[in-house]
Amino acid sequence: MLSVWNLPVEQQPQQQQQQQQNIINSSNNINSINSALDNILNTTSKGIQLPRFNLLNTSSSGFLTNSNDTLFLENNNNNNNNINQQLNKSVLNSSNKQLDIIKTINEISNEHKSFQPFEITPIKPQSTSTNTYNTEFGVINQNTFVLDSNKIEELRVDTSVLDPLLSLPYNIINNTTNNNNNNNNNNNNNNNNNNSNNNNSNNNNINNNNNKSNTPMKKESTIRNSNSTFEKFESPTLSTTFGLNKEELNTFTTTDMNNYVKQANMVKELSQVEKKELKRQKRLIKNRESAHLSRQRKRERLTDLEHRVEELSSNSIDINKTLSSLENENLILKAEVGQLFEVINDSPVLSALFYKIASLSQQPQKDTIGAY
């Protein structure tokens, strides 16, 4: 809080008196100083008085014939006169300034302006909110805003949470609005009839008016009750006759949809718009099922191909292993055969037996060739 105070008018004369007293004291001090200086000049030595006598009783030539001391003292006297003149000028200037100050103070006192103290308080913002937190002036209450990850995931999964009317078809909304308008019109007509009955009954006696005034109230209550029961009866049929929600479209099958249509036909004769809507929903369900089946077949085919590739890759690995082992065995056998040929060539007996065996083995081959 900042407070500003101005002096009232009653205290101003006291200040003026104090200032005038200060001015008088300063002027008295200046006069005492001047008188002291004059006394000092009058009570000087003989050497100081001689030049005055010479100045008054002698000529200029006699004055010049005096000693140097007298000339020096004359110069001191002139200097003192200059000092006195400067002091008088300063006193006059200070007195003039003090008179100007006194004039301004008198002018202010003549205006008679009384100033009262006032307070400077900060302006608080007017808020109609029911916030219990104490907010300071010029400070913004910044509440931390945190997003809920669970709610974001729910919105990503089900967009129908945003607005339930968006999940319903366009025809359902129009039909519901039309039904509500019709019900409101019927209620207005009933109220108008009741008002006309009341106006007619006012022309009769007071007792008759009291008796008749109770009957339309009963009629209105019965009409309202009947309307409420009718709405309660129609509320479950709206979802059964006008179509399915988005969740139901994602969960229903063709058999469920056929049963749903049968129940709707049993409850109410469907209009052309409703039939088109149900056909559209059937087509959507069939497309969803066919797409699901095609995806399932593709998935099964892909899984079969993956298993087949795995089997073939394992078989190829086994075959490569057997080939490598057979190649090694073939190399070993070739080495053994080469060693046997060397042994046979080294021994003549073995070479003779080898040639006989070879000749005997070639004769039956020739016989078979001749028979063919």
From Swiss-Prot:
CDD domains: bZIP_HY5-like. Residues 1-20, 176-234 are annotated as: Disordered. GO terms for molecular function: DNA binding; DNA-binding transcription factor activity. SMART domains: BRLZ (SM00338). The keyword Transcription applies. Residues 223-234 have a biased composition (Polar residues). Gene3D superfamilies: 1.20.5.170. It is found in: Nucleus. Residues 11-20, 176-215 have a biased composition (Low complexity). It comes from the Eukaryota. GO terms for cellular component: nucleus. The keyword Nucleus applies. Residues 279-301 are annotated as: Basic motif. Keywords: DNA-binding, Nucleus, Transcription, Transcription regulation. Residues 305-340 are annotated as: Leucine-zipper. Residues 277-340 form the bZIP domain. Belongs to the bZIP family. Probable transcriptional regulator. PANTHER family: BASIC-LEUCINE ZIPPER TRANSCRIPTION FACTOR E-RELATED, BASIC-LEUCINE ZIPPER TRANSCRIPTION FACTOR F-RELATED. This is Probable basic-leucine zipper transcription factor G. The gene is bzpG.
